[in-house]
């Protein structure tokens, strides 16, 4: 019986609103969960109080999402509410942690926004960008006193946990931070390295094609440095000559200075050689 009561309360909280004056709707709600007798009487008697509970829970959930993606919610305006309501009804959150709520909402909403002409195309990228900032901010930064280890071509490169490589179709990272802004982003393919600095700030580095390909190999594919260099050069249609190797070394040195690169990974491949990061500008 406890399970039936919990299911009824979940529907009341997350499903379509039932008016306290709609006796047939209340009766149908109780019948759906096979509640009768003293339980039905108690729930009916306390229905107005349960409606207040519904309002508080939904307000907390709405507020948690709005705090994470405020500019997205502001740009949607009143149109956000139907998406929020449908999320709670069709794919209610399974977690007790509010930090996991927005990723669940976006997993539900983004495919639907893609097919909704009333939602601006760039909004999915903006929502992902805002949510990513909160995610990265919650992860550990590099200790301030850490000294990056020398790199080796036959081994991979180790990054801090608070590092993400993302691709957008719109330059949403250049939009103003003000929630009231309605400036439109430029439509452009963008690759960003997002990381938490030793000063505990979330920072962004926009990458060119070669740098993006190199970091994709190192971060996403966990390739050895030599293999990642070869792959990145091919993808960027550039010769892997001394000039490109210098650009790569400068990029890796810059990432070490920024606090996102820790040094070589413990994974070893076949050939042995070494590449030491040197200071300079990123590729």
Task: State the predicted function of each range.
Residues 1-149, 200, 205-283:
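Long, charge-rich, low-complexity alpha-helical segments
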Residues 159-220:
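Low-complexity, glycine/alanine/valine/leucine- and proline-rich hydrophobic stretches
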């Amino acid at each position: 019986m406890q399970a039936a009561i919990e299911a009824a309360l979940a529907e009341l909280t997350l499903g379509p609103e039932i008016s306290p004056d709609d006796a047939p709707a209340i009766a149908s709600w109780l019948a759906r969960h096979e509640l009768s007798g003293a339980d039905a009487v108690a729930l009916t008697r306390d229905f107005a109080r349960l409606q207040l509970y519904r309002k508080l829970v939904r307000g907390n959930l709405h507020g948690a999402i709005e705090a994470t993606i405020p500019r997205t919610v502001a740009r949607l305006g009143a149109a956000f509410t139907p998406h929020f309501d449908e999320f709670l009804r069709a794919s209610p959150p399974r977690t007790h942690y509010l930090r996991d709520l927005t990723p669940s909402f976006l997993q539900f909403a983004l495919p639907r926004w893609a097919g909704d002409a009333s939602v601006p195309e760039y909004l999915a990228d903006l929502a992902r960008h805002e949510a990513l900032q909160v995610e990265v901010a919650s992860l550990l930064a590099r200790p301030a006193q850490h000294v990056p280890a020398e790199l080796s071509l036959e081994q991979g490169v180790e990054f801090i946990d608070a590092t993400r490589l993302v691709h957008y179709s719109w330059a949403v990272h250049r939009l103003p931070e003000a929630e009231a802004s309605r400036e439109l982003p430029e439509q452009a393919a963008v690759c960003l390295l997002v990381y938490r600095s030793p000063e505990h700030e979330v920072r962004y580095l926009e990458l060119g094609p070669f740098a993006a390909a190199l970091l994709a190999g190192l971060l996403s594919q966990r390739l050895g440095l030599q293999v990642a260099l070869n792959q990145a050069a091919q993808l960027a249609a550039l010769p892997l000559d001394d000039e490109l190797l210098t650009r790569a070394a400068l990029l890796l040195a810059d990432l070490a200075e920024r606090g996102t690169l820790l040094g070589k990974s413990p994974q070893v491949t076949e050939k042995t050689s070494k590449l030491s990061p040197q200071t300079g500008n990123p590729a």
